[in-house]
Amino acid sequence: MVSSDYFSTGDGHQLYWERHGTPGGEPIFFLHGGPGGCSDRRHLEFFDGRCFDIILFDQRGCGRSVPHGELQYNDTGRCVEDIEALRQHLGFGTISMLGVSWGSWLAIQYQQRYPEAVLKTTLVSVFVPFAANVSAYDQTLNGGLSATAHGAYAVSAGAIYQILNNGCATQQRQAALHWLRATLQLSGQSMQPSALEEFVDDEALRAIRLELHYHVNQYFFTTADEAPSLDAQTEVIQGISDTFGMASVRWLRRRQPLRCRLLNAGHNAFELAILKTVRQSLKREHLR
């Protein structure tokens, strides 16, 4: 690691950031998934550190940013402005971006607002929160919650969110466990009950609540977001088994031509097919 610090947004949030790779290399911002996720050293696997000046940072309320899980002044627009503020703070003229899952939408939004500041953009396991996609995702989530209810009374994402905001400590913990069991099952993953119980601490509760804060607000998608324009240096890397990612790609393609590499993979960007393709793509684009 070259350096790390906190950056004040000026409205109560402190964003944790780290700098890796080679100072003077091509500056690239990694935009993590979620909402409510975080950056991690494992994300460095996407990059050749000899070529890139890599910035990892935790979005508002995420990871090591503080206050953790804070909902006030936490929306898509402010997260996009944070990218620009960090770019200026770190002294970069232009930046490339690698956006994964939710981070891909932030990268698209940043490119709309600050096209002159963008060198290249790579979108991986894309998620675009247009109305039909969010509705389908919500139905899938609610179906998963119903299937794993086992007597629980919260069988919708909205109900889980209300409990996490207003329930007692016991209710919040049970709601979080229910949410995680459902989302793990939907993603084809599993955890031992004892491991799941241990995982659900106060930090996990706040992260789930933040994720649902975005979900119940339709990810703050507006009519102005209906017609994004991506530049020619934007590349999409997408697994074909990722239902909502493929819906997002089709939505983007209806609006403009798209450089897109479709892979026999799902949503997880650490699947070997996706990871290798991202590394190769970033290296190839860097050499241009």
Language-model region placement:
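Conserved alpha/beta-hydrolase
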Residues: 49-67
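Conserved acidic catalytic loop of the alpha/beta-hydrolase fold
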Residues: 77-95
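Alpha/beta-hydrolase
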Residues: 142-226
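Flexible "cap/lid" loop of the alpha/beta hydrolase fold
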Residues: 121-157
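Catalytic histidine-centered segment of alpha/beta-hydrolase-like enzymes
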Residues: 244, 262-276
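Conserved hydrolase catalytic core segment
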Residues: 93-135
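The serine-hydrolase catalytic nucleophile loop
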Residues: 35-48
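Short beta-strand/loop motif that positions the catalytic acidic residue
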Residues: 230, 236-238
